[in-house]
Amino acid sequence: MTHHYRELRGRTQAYIGALLGVNYQTVARWEKSKKCPDVGEVLGLAKYLKIPQELSNYMEDIARNEAQKNFQADRRFNALCLQFAEMYNGVICKWDPYLIPGIAQTRAYHFGVVPMTQNYTAAQLKRGWKFKLERSRALLARTDEPKVVLIISDVALRNLRFLSEPDRLAQLKRLQYLDSLPNWEIRIVATLYPEGATAFSIYRAGEAEHGGPDFVYTEVWDNSWCIEEDTRIKRYDDLWNILLGKSIALKEYLDDRRDGLAEEHP
């Protein structure tokens, strides 16, 4: 976030460091996730870089809880973190047993299928779609080609029956387009998978210059977590490998004409 808004405001690391009373190497360490600024420094960054209040609040919470490896917050708060992870991290892996991940959804899917999962107001749906668009466009605009792997349960594809045929076709074409990109891979799990394998994402810095620390994102009904604890990340890595082993390529799944999807949408 520091790097993003410093670049956006056209300021150097030395300039920001001088304002905050630290050297430019310290600012560089913040931007490379080697060190976390303290709360006072976050307040200074927010002021001088004109960081939006919501993001500033999130950064303050991170600074206050720097020692915690499992950062708990509501979905909206942690979604702001995911937005930046998708802009800067080098490896992005997502599993979802019920829905197509937001960065791969079409407008029709967002407004036609997502509302069936819970009651959303029109304003919430509108804001949610705007946020998904921002995230997907920022990710696809990256020139460093981060590795993106999506593993989706075939339940998510069978739920396309709730859309009209043109909208089903558009969503499948969206998935096929993303899968065709050299740095993207979409795979489908069409068999039983481990109990408790609810949706989660793994983000890694990889080769990205400004990628954040490795972490796992997961959520329950009223909260979500960004997990940096190595032993817990390892358990999610193990689960990811199980799911990967049970998955097949999107093209293979569609070519099998499972549930008529490939036949309806060549």
What are these regions (language model features)?
Residues S164-P266:
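C-terminal regulatory/effector modules of DNA-binding transcriptional regulators
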Residues H3-L19, Y24-Q25, R29-N159, D238, ...:
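Interdomain hinge/linker segments and adjacent boundary elements that couple functional modules
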